[in-house]
Amino acid sequence: MENKAVNVANKIMYHISRENNWNIGDVLIAGERENQFWSICKDYSPRVIVDGKEMSIFQMIDQVSNFEVTQNNITFLYQKLKDVSKEMAFYIREQIFEDVRSKHYPMLPSRQKCLWVCEEDQIAYWKTMKEDCQCSLLTLELNGELFCGDDHWLTADTFSSVDYTDRAKHYWNGEMSDAPRKEFLFYGKAIIKEIISIKALR
């Protein structure tokens, strides 16, 4: 069964933005170019400081034999492995999800170009994902196309393209889990109606 995005007009929804240079009345156009999330994801190439020297992860790996076996070094290496694994899982997931969308669901908004928005009753959940940043909650008036997916299918806990392909089909079909965490992908024009600091929300 073909899944389609829903056309919306003057619909009020919300977006949590890491940028803080917005003004009421500003217009956001989604769907024409890559969004910030994907731009950062595809360009991920971490640098680390080892003995006061900045280097790439691969340069650090080449020097592992010189590391003393101390708890601090073990903790340091574990944290870097955790960080890199997480980001690589994100990248593989997003690339596979886009491949599946473009081949089988081309009528739906791309996660690489969309604007993520949520409904009012979802703000509290998505706020917990952004509490480590100086973010703003934007109240938006939307005119365009909207797709609803379940964040449940986006769990980044594997490097397997087979697993992500299966999850992507569930996601793009709009299937909801028993306890769905809804997210909305938007293409079109969004007008900023209100701006509130995330930290000001209770």
Language model: regions and residue ranges:
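Short His-Asn-centered micro-motif
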Residues: V117-E119
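Conserved NAD+-utilizing ADP-ribose enzyme module
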Residues: E2-K11, S17-A89, S110-K113, Q122-S136, ...
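Short linear interaction motifs
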Residues: M88-Q112
